[in-house]
Amino acid sequence: MKKNIEGITVVSPMWGDLTITNRMVFSVLNQYLGKDDPINIELVLVDDYLEGRGEDDSSPYEFYLTDEFKKLYDTEHIEIKLIKNTEHKYQGESREIGFLAGKYDWFILVDCDDMLAPNACDRYRHIINSYYDEDENGNRKEEGELACVYGYLYSFGEHGYEHNIVGESIWVQSRCYNRKFIIENDVHFPTGTNSRQGEDYPFIRKLDYALSHDSVWKAVKVPYNSGVDCQATAFWFPNDNSLSRQDPHYGCHLAGWTMASSNSIIEYFMDYNKKHGLEDQEDEAMKHEVLNMTVYAFYNFLHFLREVASTDYEPLEADWEALRVNVKKLKKKLKDVFWDEIVYSDIEDMLYNVHHHSDIQFTESWLGTFNDFINKGFWWKKKDLLDLDYKQMREYCKTLEFDGAGHEVHSPQVVAWVKRHPRPDKES
C-alpha cells in the first residue's frame, strides 16, 4: 500500500514579543495545504520566555489559542499547541520538548524569528510520499526507511532573498525529520545553557553520523522526483532579524558553547561506535575528528583571551567557565587517547586547515606551539591558564598587549623581530 503521511509537526522554541513571533506563526498558518488532499499541520510552540510571563504565569503566546485568533486560519487542518517551560530550557532543549510532544512522525524545526516558505509542508509531504511510491505490482521504487529530507535555506541580502546553503547544512531548519529515527539513535540537543546557541551543529553531526552507519535509514535531498525549482524549506533571517545575534555576548557565548558542542559530538561518536562495534573501524576517523576539534579549541581559546585583553568587552563569568572547562576536556581526550599516534604532519596539516578553511577567528599564539599546549600547558603565576578562575583570567588579560597586526608585543617571536629590526634614531 502506498504510504501517505498523516501530517507534519512544526516546532518552534518561543521568546520575544508578538511583533517578532507573529511572522513565524503566520507563515505556518498560511501554508499551502494542497488542492485535493489537504495536509494536516500541528504547530507546537514551546514557551521559554519566562521573563514575558504575567504574574499568574500567563504566556503572551496564549493569544494564539484564543477563539478570536482561530478565526484567521483553517482550524480543520491546522492545530496550535502551547507548552510552557517551568524553567529555562533554551533553544535546543525546547525544540526537543516540542518534537517529542508532537503528534506526527515527521517534524520541522523553525525558530520564532524565522519563516517557512509558503509551500514547505506540502513539498515535504510530496517528497516523503514519493519516496515510498510503489509500482503497479506493489513494489517499492526505493529501499529502506526515510530518516530526513534535506531542503534549501534562503537568507535575505541586499538584493532580496538569495540562495544561501544547500545539502548538508548544519542548520536544523533545513530539514524535515522522522522522529522514529531520532529516538532510535539517541540524537539529542545539548542541554542547559549549551542548548542556547550553537546547538544546531551537534544535533546535525550526530544525526548524520548515525545515518552514515545505517543501511536501512536513508536521507534524500531536494529536488527529489521534481524540478530543480522546488523550494521545500525555510526562508531564514540570520542577520538583522536574528534575536540571538542581538545579544552583545553572542560571540563569546559561542566560544564556550561551541567547545561544549565539540565534546558532545565526540562523546556521541564514541558511544555510537562502542554500541555498534565500530571502534576499530572508526579509530582513524575519530583521531582526525578529535585533533580537528582540539586545534579549533586552541585557536578559540587564544581568540577569547585576545578579545578580552584588547577591547573593552567584559565577558560573562559563565562564558569563561564554559570555555576553559570544555577546552580542557577536548585537550584531555586528545592527549589520553590519540596523542601517541599523531605525527608532526598530522598537526601541521590540521593547523593549516582550521586556520584557512574554517570560520575560526584566528589569533596567533603568543604562548607557544600547539605541541606545548598539549604537553606542557600554558602557565601564568604557576597556574595553567585553563585552571584560572574568572578574576584571575581578567588579571592575566591585563598583562597582554596587542599591536595593530594582532601580535602580542611581549611574545618571544615579536621581541626577537624587534631586536632584528631596531627603530631608526629619531634624530637621523
Regions found by a protein language model. Give the residues of each.
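Conserved nucleotide-sugar donor-binding catalytic segment
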Residues: 162-258
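Short aromatic/hydrophobic "clamp" motif used to bind/position activated sugar donors
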Residues: 107
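Flexible acidic/His/Gly-enriched loops in nucleotide-sugar-dependent glycosyltransferase catalytic domains
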Residues: 73-78, 94, 117-193
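C-terminal subregions of glycosyltransferases and related glycan-biosynthesis enzymes
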Residues: 2, 227-428
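Acidic donor-binding segment of Leloir-type glycosyltransferases
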Residues: 29-84
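Short, well-formed alpha-helical segments that are part of the catalytic scaffolds
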Residues: 17-32
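Glycine-rich, basic loop-to-helix element that forms the pyrophosphate-binding segment
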Residues: 85-102
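The conserved acidic donor/metal-binding loop of glycosyltransferases
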Residues: 111-115
